Amino acid sequence: MKDVYENPLCSRYASEKMQHLFSPQWKFSTFRRLWLALAESEQELGLPITDEQLEEMRAHLDDIDFDRAAEYEHRLRHDVMAHIRTFGDACPKAAGIIHLGATSCYVDDNTDLLQMRAALKLLRGELLAVIDALSEFAAREADTPTLAWTHFQAAQPTTVGKRATLWLQDFLLDLERLEAELARLPISGCKGATGTAASFLALFRGDAEKVLALEKKIAEKMGVPNCIPVAGQTYTRKLDSFVMNVLSGIAQSAAKMATDMRLLAHLRELDEPFEAEQVGSSAMAYKRNPMRCERVCSLSRYVVNLAANTADTAMTQWLERTLDDSANRRLTLPEAFLACDAILTLCANVVRGCKVYPRVMEKHLREELPFLATENILMRAVSLGEDRQELHEAIRQYSVRTAEDIKLRGEDGHLLDMLLADERFHLTPEVLAELLDVRQFIGLAPEQTRVFLDTHVYPVLKSRRGDIAGSVPVRV
């Protein structure tokens, strides 16, 4: 029986790995690891904490009694105190030194930052998987000619591979920003109730050097290079905003690619993967909708808007802190990562499974090449001694007449027939075929594709080969 709300990010979209990172188990076992790191560091700096107490804490990092914690929270109305009590019940000898000198934000904020670091690493692997898939696609289709579209009107031809490099470049920029944020994202450390570390200064009897050493030890034990230099009760929420802007950038790139694919699906030049028994419409049995790309666009819009939410939170924190960030962040941060995880999983799936239809592209090229080739035809005739202005006007008139035949009367275009019949253009069928060779119109597209892959993509993938995420199935 399902009679309560389920978050579709968990029930339909996000991977189990990302869901685990934002699970209660991960969060509160990290609380306990932070309490252990604090106690170990305090002992190392001379506080009276016994090895027996530390061993007891180490033995109970993951066996969390969530029912007991819920009972405590119902009574105390404080989730951190509830888990302090629950951990203390599991570690009665250590109960008196758990959370010694700390405030709630010691575990809350540090866990959030550790969570974001872990989630960014997971997204990094998934982003690399998309880049890897796109690099294979671009290399395979480097020479496949296709119409380019500007203003969604036919323009000079390009190749399918060259178009894919535009998507690739966006994702590479996202990878660069993600890695930069990950490299500099600190933890909050242990700075006490208002960021002054007064409680720890008292514990260490005024020894400021030990207070500074405490933070360094905790950061090392948690595997993070540094702590944020200063804070109020909380770390600056600008860090959340910076991270969310990375996620927003990934969503923007994904939506751009998915939108392009949706347009190409309409033109019948490309299809996303479509399962053997997949149904496109409950009414129209013939439908083959690009639903995965549509989902990418839908989730991307959500992530981009969540990024604005974190900016609002960062700028509305009062003085050393207010709690109006709490409920908002509990929703915004996990859901942004879960959605971004789903987006990248879908993108890799679509790119690896999409089908390209060169024959359809050739048809579209044949329809447009007569118009695209007129400049070359004009230049050749002028080189043979004809008047440019006179022939330019002739081409304009023939083009208008052809467009009317196509649009008003539904006929095939007759532009080439009219140009062949006009002796001023000095054309023969053989010459015309040569002038219409699509290879004359794609410029450096194949070479640009290969150079971009060799110079900008393959080195990135080679140096990070072990970090590329494996395939994750799309559930629905």
Regions found by a protein language model. Name each.
Residues R77-V80, L127-L134, A164-L178, L247-M257, ...:
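Alpha-helical transition-metal enzyme core signature, strongest for iron centers
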Residues A139-G161, D271-K287, E320-A327, R352-L372:
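Glycine-rich cofactor-pocket loops
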Residues K216-Q233:
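A short, charged helix-loop
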Residues T234-E269, Q278-A339:
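A conserved active-site cap/scaffold subdomain adjacent to cofactor or substrate pockets
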Residues D271, A394-R401:
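Active/binding-pocket-proximal capping segment
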Residues Y302-R388, A394:
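Long, amphipathic alpha-helical stalk/connector segments used for oligomerization, subunit docking
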